C-alpha cells in the first residue's frame, strides 16, 4: 500500500506489517507503523482499529485476510474494507461477506503494465487511463468483473467522490 498517498492528503494512516525492516523503514519515513501480524489478536487494537474508518488489507494470503476481517469486525462491526486477493473466487466470497472492494492483485498489476505500454506507444495519459478503466468495468477481467447473478457495478474511479479541487 502507498502510505504517502494518504499522508499527502492529510489522512491518518497506521500500517501493520510483519516485516520488521519494512516497519522500521516506514517509521524512519514518518509513517506510523506497528510490527506484527494483523491476524493475531491484539494487533489491530494496538493499531487503533476502534477509531478506523477504513481497513485496507494488502496481503495476498486468503486465510489471513479472512481472519483479519473477522478480528476487525469484532472491534468495529461494519468497518469499510478493501482487500487484495489472488482469485475471482476469493473476490466473490469476500464480496458476499460485505467487503467494500476486493481486487485481484495480479490483475491490477497487469493493468499498470498495460498503461505503461500504452504510454510507451504514444497514447495520451487520458486515453490510456480510459482504456484501462474500460477494461476494469467491461467485465473483461477487472476487479469489477460482473458475475451473471449480479447487477453491473461501477469502478471506484467512477463513483461519486468529494468535489475535485
Pin down the residues of each PLM region.
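Cytosolic regulatory regions of ion transport systems
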Residues: 1-165
Amino acid at each position: 500500500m502507498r502510505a504517502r498517498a494518504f499522508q499527502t492528503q492529510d489522512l491518518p494512516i497506521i500500517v501493520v506489517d510483519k516485516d520488521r525492516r519494512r516497519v522500521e523503514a516506514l517509521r524512519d519515513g514518518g509513517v506510523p507503523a506497528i510490527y506484527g501480524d494483523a491476524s493475531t489478536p491484539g494487533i489491530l487494537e494496538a493499531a487503533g482499529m476502534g477509531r478506523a474508518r477504513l481497513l485496507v488489507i494488502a496481503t495476498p494470503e486468503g486465510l489471513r485476510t479472512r481472519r483479519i476481517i473477522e478480528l476487525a469486525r469484532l472491534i468495529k462491526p461494519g468497518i469499510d474494507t478493501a482487500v487484495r486477493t489472488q482469485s475471482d473466487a476469493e473476490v466473490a466470497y469476500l464480496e458476499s461477506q460485505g467487503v467494500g472492494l476486493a481486487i485481484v492483485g495480479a490483475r491490477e498489476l497487469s493493468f499498470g503494465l498495460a498503461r505503461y505500454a500504452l504510454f510507451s506507444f504514444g497514447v495520451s495519459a487520458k486515453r490510456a487511463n480510459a482504456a484501462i478503466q474500460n477494461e476494469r468495468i467491461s467485465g473483461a477481467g477487472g476487479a469489477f468483473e460482473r458475475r451473471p447473478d449480479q447487477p453491473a457495478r461501477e469502478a471506484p474511479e467512477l463513483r461519486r467522490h468529494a468535489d475535485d479541487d
